[in-house]
């Protein structure tokens, strides 16, 4: 009632139609209704779809099917190698690929191509194929949608804990069980619920990649000018005769985060008005352009840091002292306590900074924690990149050796390379420094958005969080040095 409706009855009808399409349980809520779509943030971005060759490739019916068709059979081969191959992970092709190539590809890929990995993911592709054979198409429960952030945060922390506490890297069989379990969940939820509900609301790996993808220099967004003035049929959501709608149930003009986009290109194929843009942007720009921040998402980001740090410190004197306090308990219990303490400590440190910063910003501590906690994302991402870079370099060297020994192709022998440890350490430290700088810049930009005039006040507001970022950077430096070298 407080909106002027410059588009008259057509804009009103379109707005209500969109609201009905995305509403849950047939109830319209304020968050289902959005207007004034014409405001877009296109400055400083390059639309790659202006290239005819790129546009043709994305609109092709082979995209991304051709990649999924290759990934799905490979996934089953990988499972066979994990279950039936050698128990020694250094001799098992499946285990080497999973940990030396698979995980690094996911982490680095979240930056390089955002959440496109979820379009390639064989588990999601197999679930989608199962859906075509049998589908009940039940609407995903609204209460699970509301708790999705918590479910993803807890399940992602469980995956990180499981990997460390059970030394999953040393057991190809257990690695296979984990991948098989995720695939079965994906198939079950694909058959029972509408669209790709598992990938959107529940998948722990997809949830982690979605959060990390916020830092990516790529984004798929709609030109909301076109949506508001020309579209009344919403093919991006409902689909067309040749292509289904958004698998994540997103309305293109309301999409503002890489977290909810797997870059499958369905909206590009379906939109008859050419409103979709594949933008090249400044990495991390999405964070300082956000209008709403969720404390749960920030908790997940900081907890990912805590989980990573707990593993890096596991071989150091801090863990030794902690272990001696509980030496009479089973080792897995002691590590679980250490894992929990690391997560809670990282969150507590950020919370204290938020309590101080909120006194300057004039917002609540929760709002401040949500905003600046997300600013730590570049540091967390590069921390994971630095961690997995070591395995990519030092475990990856065994991959061609094992291929050569297994398949007796001499070409694999020529692919063996070695990298001096000092080079690896330098690359890891450089990544962490870049992430720390990115966090500081984004933190400042977030304060700038809150106080656009008084520079001194912005600096005072952001300083506690900059200090936290520097402390967390120092722990990463120490952890990498002590764990790997």
Label for each model-derived stretch:
Residues 35-257, 269, 273-485:
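Non-ligating segments of multi-cofactor redox enzymes
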Residues 1-37:
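Nucleotide-binding/hydrolysis machinery
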Residues 22, 206, 264:
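Short Cys/His-rich metal-coordination motifs, predominantly Zn2+-binding knuckles/fingers
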Residues 259-263:
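Aromatic- and glycine-enriched pocket-lining scaffold segments that form the walls
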Residues 6, 126, 264:
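Short glycine-rich loop/turn motifs that provide flexible caps or phosphate-binding loops at active sites
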Residues 14, 264-269:
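P-loop NTPase catalytic cores that bind/hydrolyze ATP
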């Amino acid at each position: 009632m407080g909106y002027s409706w410059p588009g008259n009855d057509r804009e009103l009808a379109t707005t209500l139609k969109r609201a009905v399409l995305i509403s849950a349980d047939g109830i319209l809520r304020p968050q289902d209704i959005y207007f004034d779509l014409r405001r877009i943030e296109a400055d400083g971005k390059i639309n790659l779809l202006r290239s005819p060759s790129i546009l043709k490739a994305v609109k092709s019916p082979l995209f991304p099917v051709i990649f999924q068709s290759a990934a799905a059979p490979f996934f089953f081969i990988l499972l066979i190698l994990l279950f039936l191959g050698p128990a020694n992970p250094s001799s098992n092709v499946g285990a080497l690929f999973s940990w030396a190539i698979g995980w690094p590809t996911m982490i680095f890929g979240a930056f390089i191509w955002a959440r496109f990995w979820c379009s390639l993911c064989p588990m999601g592709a197999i679930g989608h194929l199962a859906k075509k054979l049998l589908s009940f198409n039940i609407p995903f429960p609204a209460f699970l949608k509301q708790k999705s952030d918590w479910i993803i945060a807890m399940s992602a922390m469980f995956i990180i804990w499981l990997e460390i506490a059970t030394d999953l890297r040393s057991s190809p069989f257990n690695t296979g069980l984990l991948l098989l379990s995720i695939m079965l969940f994906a198939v079950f939820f694909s058959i029972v619920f509408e669209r790709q509900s598992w990938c959107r609301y529940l998948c722990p790996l997809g949830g982690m990649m979605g959060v990390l993808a916020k830092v990516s220099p790529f984004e798929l967004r709609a030109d909301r000018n076109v949506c508001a003035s020309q579209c009344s049929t919403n093919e991006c959501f409902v689909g067309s005769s040749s292509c289904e709608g958004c698998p994540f149930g997103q309305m293109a003009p309301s999409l503002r985060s890489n977290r909810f986009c797997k870059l499958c290109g369905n909206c590009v194929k379906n939109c008859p008005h050419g409103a979709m843009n594949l933008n090249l942007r400044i990495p991390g720009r999405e964070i300082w352009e956000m209008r709403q921040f969720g404390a749960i998402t920030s908790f997940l980001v900081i907890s990912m840091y805590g989980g990573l740090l707990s593993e890096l410190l596991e071989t150091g004197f801090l863990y030794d002292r902690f272990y001696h306090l509980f030496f009479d308990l089973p080792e897995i219990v002691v590590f679980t306590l250490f894992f929990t303490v690391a997560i809670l400590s990282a969150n507590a440190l950020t919370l204290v900074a938020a309590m101080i910063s909120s006194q300057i910003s004039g917002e609540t501590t929760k709002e401040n924690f949500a905003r600046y906690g997300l600013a730590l994302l570049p540091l967390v991402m590069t921390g994971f990149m630095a961690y997995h870079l070591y395995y990519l370099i030092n475990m990856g060297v065994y991959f061609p050796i094992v291929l050569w020994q297994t398949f007796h192709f001499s070409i694999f022998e020529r692919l063996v390379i070695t990298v001096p440890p000092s080079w690896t350490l330098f690359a890891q430290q450089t990544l962490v420094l870049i992430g720390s700088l990115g966090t500081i810049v984004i933190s400042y930009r977030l304060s700038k958005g809150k106080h656009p005039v008084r520079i001194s006040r912005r600096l005072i507001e952001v300083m506690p969080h900059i200090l936290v970022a520097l402390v967390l950077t120092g722990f990463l430096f120490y952890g990498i040095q002590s764990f790997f070298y």
